[in-house]
């Protein structure tokens, strides 16, 4: 990053500190998501913020960037960059890709990201596994499904607070 010590704007820091929810992703882990944590003032505000912090994990690996990564490795990379575990929730895809989709992506060196639910939960993070893939040819997040999961989580948090997991398994699938 240039400059390496780029300052965060006061308005960005204040927006993070005033936020109810901070959502990271989906997107390229090292070129879209992690860069948000490279600016020290932003990273510090994210860690200090009392907002619920949600990471939306990619559904496929990116050749040359996240080869062999499951959801756990994505989360580990975020935590390593932040210097501390800061996430409350991780939304992961648990839907299988079709054989045709898998063949198409194998040619490019891309594989489905494994959900790694238990490994992530051991970090103290609640995992929301759900069927997120679009029914089109490309393996992407279905925007309507993803929006539904996020909105359901927001309503659940408003109604019950951070600690209720019941909805995760019965109503968000």
Residue ranges and their predicted role:
Residues 1-3:
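Binuclear metal-dependent hydrolase catalytic cores centered on His/Asp/Glu-rich metal-binding motifs
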Residues 5, 9, 15-17, 29, ...:
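Conserved phosphate- and dinucleotide-binding cores of soluble alpha/beta proteins
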Residues 23-25, 54-56, 91:
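Structural motif
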Residues 26-30, 129:
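Generic secondary-structure boundary/loop-capping signal
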Residues 68-173:
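C-terminal functional extensions of proteins
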